[in-house]
Design a protein with these regions (language model features):
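Helix-rich interaction surfaces within compact, conserved domain-sized segments
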Residues: 92-96
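Amphipathic alpha-helical interaction surfaces in cytosolic regulatory modules
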Residues: 11-35, 40-89
Length: 97
């Protein structure tokens, strides 16, 4: 079973560290018992640092296979998908999220 985490309340842009930290906390709490579907409906942009904090942290806390088994994305734009990928890459390159 997966729980949907809607990011529409943060739309149209997720750019502050405070928002990213709140989203990360919510996702970590849900991941204790459920898989997640992250719904990006109405989100047009996300800062790379926000993606690094949220998805880089989660990616580094589990292996790649587990990350993609437990976290799915819907309603993403090509820009959002690229930002998520870059956030994960930057987290891995820096050695910390």
């Amino acid at each position: 079973m997966s729980k949907v985490i809607s990011l529409s309340s943060y739309a149209p842009s997720i750019g502050s560290e405070e928002k990213a930290a709140e989203i990360l906390h919510n996702m970590q709490t849900v991941l204790e018992s459920d898989n997640i579907v992250v719904d990006f409906e109405n989100v047009q942009t996300m800062g790379t640092n926000c993606a690094k904090l949220i998805f880089g942290t989660l990616y580094k806390s589990m292996d790649a296979e587990k990350f993609y088994e437990r976290i799915n994305f819907i309603h993403t734009t090509p820009n959002i998908r690229r930002t998520i990928r870059l956030g994960i890459e930057f987290a891995l390159a820096s050695g910390k999220a």
